[in-house]
């Protein structure tokens, strides 16, 4: 009888082992915080690497921005970020890092400050301080990076240009680099969409680089830049205009034009380049 009990306990321990180990595996959590600036609750997803189970360790952080019509769950549900990050870390191609995916609204809100939506203020005055005081993050420029796709690529670029003291690197995928003011924007019957379009005009990354002073240029150049856009992307020309401005100002950058369009398949593959790239910045 004693042998049977011993065998049963050993078998139970063997069966339960994967569940016990699951607590130390990489996790992707969905959380929330209250914003006084926006006057609402904002949700976010956060990837915690395997090493986060060691309470004595701290980690670099990547803020990963979604695109238009999506939310904080897009990189989790469509971008396969957890599996790709874990694969790259396990293969030694990327550092262990915390990846934070904020919510910039579902449609036509975005990452800029505009009437009734001070998202840029929220991001830097509330969101980053909340994240970096809640989780074990190394809170300095060298260990902080930003990346994003489409609208989030534009937000990535704008934030890295105007808050260069915050980020060691910026990786813009299929980015909306800016819009030129046109009568069709002011005639748009959708007021919410019109506000978003007007904010994209006011926060034009191309113009920001073109008009940069020598002091501003030096700050922008303190960020390691990577522009990634597909040869079939409708924003290809928009990205080439940004590259032209960077070249004129002699700001170093890396450019990758790959086969593909404005698709999740493209952005999933971009992560295989983005995470090693920001990891190199963390190590500098």
Task: Describe every region a protein language model picked out.
Residues 1-4:
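Positively charged n-region of N-terminal signal peptides that target proteins for export
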Residues 6-15:
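Bacterial N-terminal signal peptides
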Residues 16-20:
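Sec/Tat signal peptide C-region and signal peptidase I cleavage site
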Residues 21-284:
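Non-catalytic cap/lid and distal C-terminal segments of serine-dependent acyl enzymes
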